[in-house]
């Protein structure tokens, strides 16, 4: 705003004091007459001026204003003053003081009519070239008077003869007089009325002013005072003839004001009354029953005499006081006090105001406004406003439609009958600035309230001491608006909120439609729209001015109320602390930023009982701290990026982008320090109800297609420092997930995902059971090499790839250093699914949903922990590398999953309790802290292995090269899963105690939770009990020769057969079986057949047998065999496991697991892994040692049995036993040495360094199938079919010379014809559908095999496999639920046994046990045929094994004893000679009987000679080798000396290095003989030298006594070796098969 220089000082024309008083009066009278005459339509007569100067008062009535003068002084081209009237004009003048001029102007009944017109392009630009940029009417008045009255003033000066008195230009004098008049004039105005409208409609904007005064605060002061009372702004429209019944003037020809054109002096004007005016009742605004007539009315105006319609827009009924002053050339001071104001708007009013405002927007060709005067640079404001009330009337969707109107005026004044009223009220407003800075303005207010139909929606600052504030700043090129709200509350009843959004949508739509309607009805606006061209996109530079809006809320509370029913209410409360909202714009660049220090969400449920609302539940939904959200887009701009900086507040900074964008992008960035989410079923239900209510009530439904558009590329970034998710289940348990850091990036365009990245750091999860037990589920594993603050555990990534016309959409997931804990007793996954995803049984799952993305999971360096139900042990699976591929789900295809595991390590621990961890915690923490110093070169593998073993775990297995595929089908709501395992290499290494624990852990993990199974074995009720007794066969026992009257304890249990007679059932054995089965099994017909009394056949399937644990005598064995056992004669060459396949053919499976190419290597180690086992053994040994040292005479038979397998015998010669090294490997020293010396020995019971037994399983294959449940009797539930190509047990004991313990018999024809060595099929059935019990059917077959049994190896296996901890023994004594076998079929097989005796148990010999008697001999090539067995009705594996042993041992003893004795080395030759002699005589007889040929005699002679020679050579070779071995041992003893300690060495067999041909035998025999002779020579030649070293005769005799036997033995050793090697070479040349047998049987050297 430009300030005139004369306004700065009212006494600027002091030079006029030199003029005479008469001249001054005449000049002032002329100036006033010209000034008033210019304002009015007619000039003021000189007589009127004379009256003014004589009486000091001039009053004029019924005046018309000079609109040309008004248009000239108000130099805006779009404003045209068409008519103006004054009812009364009073001018007062203090004529006594002309120098200090004091003029008072009073105006009554001012009426102005302003018409907005489009700019006239024909006008010259010079007309407006000096127009002010802001209104300065006083300057324009002076300029106007200079143009119109300057010449008249000069003529007046000449006519009056004042040239001599006026020195200078009369033009300057006139300016001074006018300036003095205007500066010293005080204005009083009453009843002012202004109409603003356009020429094309009758609707006008009416501004009414009741009273206004404008004057100086004090005389000779620069301050001006403006007082206004009663301001009213309305939108009015005259009613047409058809509506009012009276004539209406045309819109452009007549004005709203009528008057007379005469002027006269009116007396008594002080008593005139002002016209009535429309007033607002403030109570009616606040009242909920406000009527529209308070704002819209049809009335008769006193002055207008015309009926009209009006809408009250603005009203201020109090006193408006404004004081402003000019302190310097560029400083303006304004003080103002504004009373309560009311603003009442609707869509028609806003559209009409926007329509009028459009005339003030210059067209491109309109001359601009410019000024050469300096702008205002300093401003001092102090404005106080009592209150501002804004009322907004919104039309509801069902209200009247505006588009049905054709008349513009009627449309603007059509008031809907139904609508919502929104009210906003602001109290105690103050606007000020500091330091006179116009670039910084501050606005404060005490409180702000928003109502909707008298219901409070928003309340800010009411309950706090500090006021709300708005600060406007302009600093350099940044314009900012800072809004500070100390506190507030937003309460949104959901019904009101939905009505609010509906009304807002209708409100904005009405404004838009009305604007378009008004623009189309105006030719000027229509022409502008037709010629308007959209601005072209422009490049935005970073140095353009920026505009910022910052809104800060210290405390904010948002409440959402939703009525679920008439008796239920849901309340959602958001509590926000320090909320910052920022919007920054630079040109077309725009960014929105939201920062929240703390935000919490709480949900509450209320029920109404007896008209009282009671809180039922309350829960916290989520909590955030220090969260930041920012969004911007690059639409129509150059490439730029946004960075966030923090000083006092967070604010975005625009920077040039490093890369160019291909098309517009929208960016969303979200960062939060702590994000905690708490979810319960109630919270989910309430949020779901809230979402459904909002979604169903939206005016424009939100769909995925409307959320995204393909024209934009959307980018989302999320950063979370700490994230936690808590899920509460129905049973009171909860699941908590926590991430220390989250990084998320996602890019999409429309509905197309472009890229995705999600990184989770330091992931952990816990499960809180119903009993408040905290169980860790997921945990992160730290890398001890690097002290990383954040460890990446999960990485999800996706990138859209297009190749060869097809989309390869794959989501990559990488999981590293993550641990998962599995608890069978806490099924947290099923609990979560039951709680949050309940399945409706009436709505089956028909098909998988479409998921067009492949998933590739890469799992590295992770651990899975398996926690049993009832044990303290734990199993760890260390997954070094695991790859999972999941195919996309498209078009109802099955779910395909492929799993590849390169290497997995299995660890186990016996007790996972605090006592175990306490000893390891300090060490582990120290190693973690100092890992970079102690372990700088450790790999991830070594580090995790170190941590696991430090906690007490033992590595028990390694699984490599696992390949698994999974296919899941969903057809008609039924799932069928096919799992295929194509490859697996398993390496197992364990001790006896860890093996026993592993079996128990796997059994515990595979078992199901205990359930009520009381109806499993209930007998069916007998409907007719009497009838059932009549069906008893009383002769049953008599027919079987059983005395049922005797003592039942002395009788064996007899099983009742269902149909067949037991006496007629016998075992039939084919005598010629051995002839056709094996050439080594001829002449089996000579064996005695089994009588029919030995076995009993039982056809029942539910029999229970009782088999004695030991084979005591023949009669007891026969009684034991009469218990549901059936021997079936068949040849194993024709054996098949297809007998059970017919029962499962054609059934639909639910789960099927197929596996093949599985290889298992199991290394059995001596010693013990667990500290508890070692402590028990060491304690027992220590007790025996103590008792041995105290008692000289101890029974040699005293012994202690530990763990059902370890026998510790008493011994007397033992010294101190040190148990401090009990955890060291057991093979660090020989235990025998400990017991042979009377010194301190170290007891070592730890795991042996080397394996003792190696079990190798090759090509394990088979399938496991689970079938759908059926209500049929004996329904098959599942079946297991398993087979293996080879099962080999290697003997690695140092005391054993044999290589294998068990393996396939390669000489058998069936081993060459069949691929699988062993095969088993187990079928699980349910006997009756109404019972829950399950029964098994087993079929097993094995090919002929060969066993090389060393007694030490056998003892180790027995001790290893029978190991049982006391806890497991107690468990077995509690009568567990053993599996029940309906039927067991064991197919026949052939076993060849070699057995080496080493020691015998004297107690066993005295008791007459068969195994101990057999240990006195050595067997080689003993052949045993195990017949096929069919067993019915057994419970448990123990009964099953006892039945097998009893039946097979009895059969071997009765029918195959000759085959067993044939393997005894001394007897084998006798049998061979006897069979040879038999062949000499039997073969010719059979030849003569057959074809009358004597050639069979020669064949018999050749066969006899071959067998005899081979056995003779083998027997002599064994004798020579045995003699050589004894001589070698004697030589070793003599060389070491009798007092030297025997060094432990690995047992070596001389048969392992035997020559394969006669040439090798002769060569090796010659070499051995030569070494023996050379050794004797060397010993003999060294004897004199050794005797000379001794000085005494005793030493010489001792040396000679030791060396002379060596001289004699060494040639004998060479000779026996020569004979042995020669005979072995000759025997192997004659028997090629024997060479292969020796290679398999004996260990090779090295």
From Swiss-Prot:
Q: Quick one: where's region PAS-targeting domain?
A: 1465-1490
Q: What is its main location?
A: membrane
An MF annotation (GO) of this entry: lipid transfer activity
What does gene deletion cause? Impairs atg8-processing.
Q: Which GO terms describe its cellular component?
A: endoplasmic reticulum membrane; phagophore; phagophore assembly site; phagophore assembly site membrane
Reaction catalysed by this enzyme: a 1,2-diacyl-sn-glycero-3-phosphocholine(in) = a 1,2-diacyl-sn-glycero-3-phosphocholine(out); a 1,2-diacyl-sn-glycero-3-phospho-L-serine(in) = a 1,2-diacyl-sn-glycero-3-phospho-L-serine(out); a 1,2-diacyl-sn-glycero-3-phosphoethanolamine(in) = a 1,2-diacyl-sn-glycero-3-phosphoethanolamine(out)
Q: How does it sit in the membrane?
A: Peripheral membrane protein
Q: Where is the Chorein N-terminal domain?
A: 26-121
Annotated keywords:
Autophagy, Endoplasmic reticulum, Lipid transport, Meiosis, Membrane, Sporulation, Transport
Kindly indicate whether the keyword Membrane belongs to this entry: yes
Domain of life, per UniProt, equals: Eukaryota
Annotated localization: Preautophagosomal structure membrane; Endoplasmic reticulum membrane
ER-targeting domain as annotated region, ranges: 16-35
**Function per UniProt:** Lipid transfer protein required for autophagosomes completion and peroxisome degradation. Tethers the edge of the isolation membrane (IM) to the endoplasmic reticulum (ER) and mediates direct lipid transfer from ER to IM for IM expansion. Atg2 binds to the ER exit site (ERES), which is the membrane source for autophagosome formation, using basic residues in its N-terminal region (NR) and to the expanding edge of the IM through its C-terminal region. The latter binding is assisted by an atg18-PtdIns3P interaction.
Q: Which PANTHER family match?
A: AUTOPHAGY-RELATED 2, ISOFORM A (PTHR13190:SF1)
Task: Please give the record's comment on domains.
Answer: The N-terminal region (NR) associates with the endoplasmic reticulum (ER) and is responsible for the formation of the isolation membrane at the PAS.
Which family does the record claim for this protein? Belongs to the ATG2 family.
Q: Could you tell me what this protein is called?
A: Autophagy-related protein 2
